[in-house]
Amino acid sequence: MPSMSGITRRRLLASLPAVALARRALGAGSPEGLRHEFIQAGASGPPIRVRTISHFGLAVPDPKRSVDFYQGLFGMPVQARVDTTTILRVGAGPQFISIGPAAANAAPSINHYCLGIENFAVDRVLAALAAHGVTKGDTAGPMKVAVTMRDGTPDLLFGDPDGIVCQLQDVSYCGGSGPLGNVCRTVEPSPKKGLLALRDLSHLTIFSSDAERSNTFYQDLFGLSIRSYQGPTAPTLAIGPTVAFLMFAGGAPARGGATARPASINHACMSLDGFNPEQVLKTLETHGVTPRGDSAGPAGPMKSYVTMRMENRGGAPGGTPELYFTDPDGLLMQLQDSSYCGGSGFLGNVCK
């Protein structure tokens, strides 16, 4: 979710008892017109049945530094290697984070994400994408799809209306070999135990040039239902039977002649069991990720902060704490409880 103003540790500690209090379901105050529009989009059944968030990819100038950082923090084993890309397992897998080199002179980025679908078959997926205006191209540009063969493994990537790259693979995909990319026989243990144990991938928040258009596009293509609302016109789109979701934000015109914010994957969220924001902040600090403090503007690399999502954005009465940190390249990550669904309650786990 888009970040808000930070809070101090003292305020965070004062809010911790709210974990047993905030149990309010979302949706009663949501605009019925918006709700109807989104439900109708998937009423005839999804042409492509999405079940999981499979992975997201980091493109960075120093992949080894990033691999060392994430293994040191989370103890992630190497699930597979593809050329110069290292695939780090999340939890029990097959979900993962891929870390590879950025193009020359390119800024570090979360350069794509992948959704796991049932009964993956390239021809069927291409036909479904074509029916929604996504046509074949040499690369995954806006409304274009490209399939590359990797030693017999098809990797299918397409660009949405903003050119955000989404990959579609089988739910069993591990970044490995075989027709479904689900053969990862040689798993390399992490050289470091890790300080926090990841459970799963929670969500991605994507800055779009037109959030309403993005929501409609993904609803029509995947038949995604509404998981929660983080504001009257800010739905989260449910991914399969899990608590995972996608969220699209943005689309407001730039103010005062400023340049509009380019579309991008703003941040990725990972989940862990027994989420305690104060303890997580302390653990991050032992790994060199220090509190951001009250400084204005974007957080630099290796910083952490907590924001409180209040009732007007679907949070708990006292606020739902949401914890962010930046990695060595300044890429923004979020950590939440494994039950987090983007809803209300102290843990953000109360959804409709």
Model-derived regions: residue spans:
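Core segments of cupin and vicinal oxygen chelate
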Residues: 5, 20, 48, 57-97, ...
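Residues that flank catalytic or metal-binding motifs in active/ligand-binding sites
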Residues: 52, 84, 93, 109-111, ...
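Short, charged/polar, Gly/Pro-enriched secondary-structure boundary elements
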Residues: 94-98, 107, 163-166, 175, ...
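C-terminal segment of classical bacterial N-terminal signal peptides
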Residues: 22-24
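N-terminal beta-strand motif that seeds the catalytic metal site of vicinal oxygen chelate
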Residues: 29-64, 111-113, 169-215, 243, ...
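N-terminal secretory signal peptides and thylakoid transit peptides that target proteins
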Residues: 2-20
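Vicinal oxygen chelate
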Residues: 61-64, 113-162, 208-213, 263-332, ...
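Mid-chain, structured segments of secreted extracytoplasmic proteins
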Residues: 84-120, 126-127, 252-253, 262-265
